[in-house]
Amino acid sequence: MDKLGCKKKIIILARRIKWRINQCRYHLRFVNKKCMVAPGSSISRDLVAGAYSWIGPGSIIYPRVQIGKLALLANNVTIVGGDHNYRHAGVPMVFSGRDELKPTIIGDDVWIGAQSIIMTGVSIGNGAIVAAGSVVTKDVKPYSIVGGVPARFIKMRFNEYEIEQHEQMLKQPDSYFKQFEYLLLSGKDRS
């Protein structure tokens, strides 16, 4: 076996060991074994996440969140909600309870920049990019780039032809992406 082949095998083994540690740490039953969760995150046990997704250190993820495959959540991304019920006159908010959490859907191949806040109940379409430090309060269309407080449309990531090509790639089975797996940890480890 050549040096590169050996290095790839070591990298893949390191990923598997990290996954087992994360699985024990966060009790993640619905997260694909090829999804990586960095240490220092607060993750709801009902998180659903696809293969090759990355959740950066210091992230906070409330219940009822679904993350697609190949998604990147940078450091300190927060997905929050559960607003206090403030509509009961004569009752302090601390005793008024909370509204029911709405599901939050993050599509495939989405990149959410560092320090961004995503409010629960939002849907972020496939291939979208959320700029660092943004606050997302409304749905984000597929392949759009948004940023700001609150997040607003900046531009499209791809043209129509490129979107069609990219969608075809995203339809590939997880086994297709195995050829790129060693790139996830090669060079500098992200955690």
Residue ranges, per PLM feature:
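Flexible, glycine/small-residue-enriched loop-and-beta-strand segment within the central core
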Residues: I21, S41-A49, W54-V122, V149, ...
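Acidic, glycine-centered active-site loop in nucleotide-sugar glycosyltransferases
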Residues: P142, G147-P150
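Conserved sequence/active-site signature of Rossmann-fold short-chain dehydrogenase/reductase
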Residues: T78-I79, V135, I145
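Short arginine-rich
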Residues: D139-Y143, P173
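Terminal amphipathic alpha-helical/low-complexity segments used for targeting or macromolecular assembly
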Residues: M1-H27, K33, H84-Y86, K102, ...
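Beta-rich strand-turn-strand
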Residues: A114-I129, S134-K138
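Residues that flank catalytic or metal-binding motifs in active/ligand-binding sites
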Residues: N75, A132, P142
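Extracellular beta-strand-rich, repetitive "passenger/adhesive" scaffolds
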Residues: K34-V37, I55
